[in-house]
Amino acid sequence: MRTYDVVILGSGIAGCFLSRQLKLARPELSILVLEASDKMTDYKVGESTVEVAANYMIRKLQLSTYLYQHQLPKNGLRFFFDNEKKDLPLTKMSEIGSDHMPYHPSFQLERARLERDLIEMNRAIGIDVQLGAKVTDLAIDGERSHTVTYEQGGEKRDVRCRWVCDASGRRQLVVRKLGRKVTKETRLNTAAGWGRYWNVAGLDAVQDPAWRSRVRYTSRHLSTNHMMYDGYWIWFIPLAGDLMSVGVVYDKDRIGEMPRTKEAFETFIKSHRSSRELMEGAVFEDYQGYAHLAYYTDTFFSGDRWGLTGEAGAFLDPFYSPGSDFITTANELLTSLILTDLDGKKEELQERLELHNAFYRLKYESTLRLYAKLYPIFGSFEIYRLKYLLDFNNYYNLVAWPFMADKLTDIRWLREELKFSDFVLRAQDAMADLFARWGEDLRKKGQYFAHNEGQWANGLNGVVQFQEKLGPVLDEEFRKRELDKAYSSVFTGVVERMLGTPGLSTKKRVLSELSLPHVVMLKDVNEGTVDQILKRASVRLTRDLKAEHPEAGLEKVTLERSSAEGATLKIVGVPETAPEHAALLARANELWNEPGQSLTAIRM
């Protein structure tokens, strides 16, 4: 019976990526990949990548030349917002996007071709990939070798291995064999349907000079394009070779069940003017769907030397294209565990198992909070623009940068990061509740769709401060400042719009007094929230003015809420008749109106 260091179940991108990462890290490893299909021809969902997965493919898997020659570069994420009747032409829909290719690359992947090519590239570096090899049994032995039984060409074969890694997707071969718990996620009740089509002209075929020049003729076609609606979104993702992926993801709690046949799917897509016009002349290739998207397992990596990657472990939602990032993270953690074990570092392995499981679960929980309860706000440009500012900043700061700095397998960094996991989740919950409340407030006022026509926001401008920072050196002080800035400016941006106090989110002395902990503390926004914010800012204002005029007899500066100007100032301790009062008041107003580095003030 042949023995391998690692056997990987499945040769989709999760399995192909993991085997390639292991082999490139340790060329002497013996690796077997077992794939049940005899041909890789299926057009799989999960075509769109973002910065973490792209960095992984380029830096860890050495696929840069291949990706640029055989797949499509991605022009970031792009979002369009319709009116209530869903009849705006594409050129009139409000848009969040970019006017140039992003600083950090990402790609649109034609999965069937990629997986076929990866199999051949992996074989070329010494990985044993067997197609038509259906796994029929597993014997997990935490003390000795595992045994994997598979059938191929009518013959039964057994192999032994030290590690077995499940990349079998929703079949979850290891989890089901061991009887481990798989939990259907109830906090996010979404489903999806999608198809692939030929002859879809794409967004760049729209002939409107003003609309094209607004983005400096950068290719909208190459973006992952989201058509945003109350409770659902429609995607248009280009693939190499004139193929377009078109799909819809919807919140069943918000809008119930949607059509699940190919004909009903197309009827639904075409009930939206912009999507209907994009689909004119499209030629059908295939259709698939999932009745429920989100689930997770209780353990991702085991001391019995097995691990899960990709959809074998968990899945959430395709919004923001996180699937390949989850694969990247799982593979990075699994590779570290396998190499630590093979190096004989038993104590370190036990610590890594605990930390890696906790970190991967944190990734699941923090990503969940990007969507849970928030599908009802997706259709409002006004709300979503601020949510995107926060989410995009958090992605670059908390997700992309640590990966690019190789911190995901740094034990010391993981320990410190996990200490704050509960607080990070509470902060996300606080903002999600606030966005949801704002959405309900706008609906009651009849203003949910008020800004959905004719608006343009350049999303990349909100993260320009990170572009050149992201890399191998993690600047923790900079990360903390940017985290506080993101939460304080977006929080006050929502508050000023909900409570009618303009200008709060751009004031330096408001932002400097609202760190992330204060945002969590003030999460239950009501009429008194502005007073609390102004009280904190007035303390700072008083301190600054006293420092400039220590002999003036100033007792304090007060800020009182004003619907017209946000707040009005009063000087306490210096009589209005005193000659210095007017000068102090003028200076206090100057200090109060001094702009801060607010995300909401960025010209998007």
Positions of the model-derived regions?
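Predominantly flavin-linked oxidoreductase catalytic cores and closely associated redox partners
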Residues: 121-274, 331
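N-terminal targeting leaders
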Residues: 519-604
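C-terminal helical "tail/cap" subdomain of flavin- and related membrane-associated enzymes
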Residues: 338-518
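Glycine-rich FAD pyrophosphate-binding loop
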Residues: 23-45
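FAD/FMN-dependent oxidoreductases across multiple families
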Residues: 230-232, 253-372
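Beta1/beta-strand and adjacent pyrophosphate-binding region of the FAD-binding site
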Residues: 1-14, 32
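N-terminal FAD cofactor-binding segment of flavoenzymes
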Residues: 41-87
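Short beta-strand to alpha-helix junction loop
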Residues: 99-120, 255-260
